[in-house]
């Protein structure tokens, strides 16, 4: 059976209609919405992780930056759930789509830039020119700093897309190899299945780390502008 290696990254359809939006919104269904208090170990662990992450992210911020706490926690929760759901068999991972990652990165990056221009205009403009720069180099350095600023959202989106896509491609290749070897050599198939299991564990870690890195970089941009 010959299958395009990138078929699993194509946006799925249901009855001829794109199913991307329902899939993207699905992680929100996993968040409990009961008005009653739910006391169990899973909820306690979840709350402790949220408090720890929130404490680490909001520690260097002033009151203006801390107003973004709900946004950042929602972001890391959404990306984490989306990445993990994409590891399920025959599922679709929205974070492998550069368009979706850009749709998250550009508004968040623009929000931090607007915040900096509004509340700390002088400090924001001062970042465009390092102190002590020789006069002949000023135009070139301003241009370089401007370009580096403008490519920040692209770097955010490409980093997340590349890491998630690379892991899924490896799992796809090793899975196909295991199916092919199952009719040839049983011992080699077992070794390949162990390798696939280890790679799956690694991909779970990558899914968590990439969600944290994406949110942490947005948090860093916010810290530089508040």
From Swiss-Prot:
GO molecular function: proton channel activity; proton-transporting ATP synthase activity, rotational mechanism
BP-aspect Gene Ontology terms: proton motive force-driven ATP synthesis; proton transmembrane transport
Catalysed reaction equations from the record: H(+)(in) = H(+)(out)
Pfam families named in the record: ATP-synt_A
Main location: mitochondrion
GO cellular component, one term: mitochondrial inner membrane
TM regions (residue ranges): 11-31, 68-88, 97-117, 138-158, 164-184, 194-214
Location(s) in or outside the cell: Mitochondrion inner membrane
Membrane topology: Multi-pass membrane protein
Xref: Gene3D superfamilies: ATP synthase, F0 complex, subunit A
Keyword vocabulary terms for this entry: ATP synthesis, CF(0), Hydrogen ion transport, Ion transport, Membrane, Mitochondrion, Mitochondrion inner membrane, Transmembrane, Transmembrane helix, Transport
Matching PANTHER family: ATP SYNTHASE SUBUNIT A
Matches recorded under NCBIfam families: ATP_synt_6_or_A
Function: Subunit a, of the mitochondrial membrane ATP synthase complex (F(1)F(0) ATP synthase or Complex V) that produces ATP from ADP in the presence of a proton gradient across the membrane which is generated by electron transport complexes of the respiratory chain. ATP synthase complex consist of a soluble F(1) head domain - the catalytic core - and a membrane F(1) domain - the membrane proton channel. These two domains are linked by a central stalk rotating inside the F(1) region and a stationary peripheral stalk.
Record family assignment: Belongs to the ATPase A chain family.
Summary of subunit composition and partner proteins: Component of the ATP synthase complex composed at least of ATP5F1A/subunit alpha, ATP5F1B/subunit beta, ATP5MC1/subunit c (homooctomer), MT-ATP6/subunit a, MT-ATP8/subunit 8, ATP5ME/subunit e, ATP5MF/subunit f, ATP5MG/subunit g, ATP5MK/subunit k, ATP5MJ/subunit j, ATP5F1C/subunit gamma, ATP5F1D/subunit delta, ATP5F1E/subunit epsilon, ATP5PF/subunit F6, ATP5PB/subunit b, ATP5PD/subunit d, ATP5PO/subunit OSCP.
Record-given protein name: ATP synthase F(0) complex subunit a
Species the sequence originates in: Papio hamadryas
């Amino acid at each position: 059976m010959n299958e395009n290696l990138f078929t699993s990254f194509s946006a799925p359809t249901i009855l001829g209609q794109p199913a991307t939006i329902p899939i993207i919104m699905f992680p929100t269904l996993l968040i409990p919405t009961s008005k009653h208090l739910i006391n169990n170990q899973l909820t306690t662990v979840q709350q402790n992780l949220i408090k720890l992450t929130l404490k680490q992210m909001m520690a260097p911020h002033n009151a203006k930056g801390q107003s973004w706490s709900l946004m950042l926690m929602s972001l890391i929760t959404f990306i984490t759930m989306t990445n993990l759901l994409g590891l399920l068999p025959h599922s679709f991972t929205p974070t492998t789509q550069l368009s979706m990652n850009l749709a998250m990165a550009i508004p968040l990056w623009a929000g931090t830039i607007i915040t900096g221009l509004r509340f700390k205009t002088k400090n924001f403009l001062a970042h465009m020119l390092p102190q002590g720069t020789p006069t002949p180099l000023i135009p070139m350095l301003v241009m370089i700093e401007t370009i580096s600023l403008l490519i920040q959202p692209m770097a955010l989106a490409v980093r997340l897309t590349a890491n998630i896509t690379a892991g899924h491609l490896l799992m796809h290749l090793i899975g196909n190899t295991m199916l092919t070897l199952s009719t040839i050599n049983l011992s080699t198939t077992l070794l390949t299945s162990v390798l696939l299991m280890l790679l799956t564990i690694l991909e779970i870690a990558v899914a968590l780390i990439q969600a944290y890195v994406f949110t942490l970089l947005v948090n860093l941009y916010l810290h530089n502008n508040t």
